[in-house]
Amino acid sequence: MTKFVKKDEINSEWFEIDATGAVVGRLATVVSKIIRGKNKTTYTPHMDHGDFVVIKNVDQIKFTGNKFQNKKYYRHTGYPGGIKEITPEKLSEKKPGEVLKLAVKRMLPSGALGKKQLTKLKIYSGEDHPHTAQNPKIIEIGKLNHKNIVRNYYGNCPNIFTKNKVRF
């Protein structure tokens, strides 16, 4: 018989991720799994027992290829002819964290549970955040997979790769 976790038994942890040089989609998949609680053995699709995620330096996230200028996000005002489009470049000028928030939001369920889970995502464009009292565990996104960080095209690697001697 399958055992379900009760609300009293749910413990939420806090995680901190530095988004400097991280690829948007790869970062969003890691974050959405943590927010949904898929990293726990007690995962149940209809319950919210995910963890909180604090993302700092979100203004330094990257897209691969030319998606930063060419990708388009669409929305509709509700009026006839009211479809609007915006590129990630223009959206990040107005709201730096909105690009990552949209990517994570689209990976969550679309109902009330997804909205509740999205409130566990805290995005900050600088180095500082007000959640240091929760003692978040640090997740180094570059050490999970070497494709999670954008390298420059001239062969120089970030310090994460030279310390671990990962070859490409």
Segments and roles (model prediction):
Residues 108-124:
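C-terminal structural segments of small proteins and small subunits
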Residues 123-131:
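Short, highly charged C-terminal tails/helix-capping segments
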Residues 1-102, 108, 112, 130-168:
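Ribosome large-subunit tunnel/peptidyl-transferase-proximal elements
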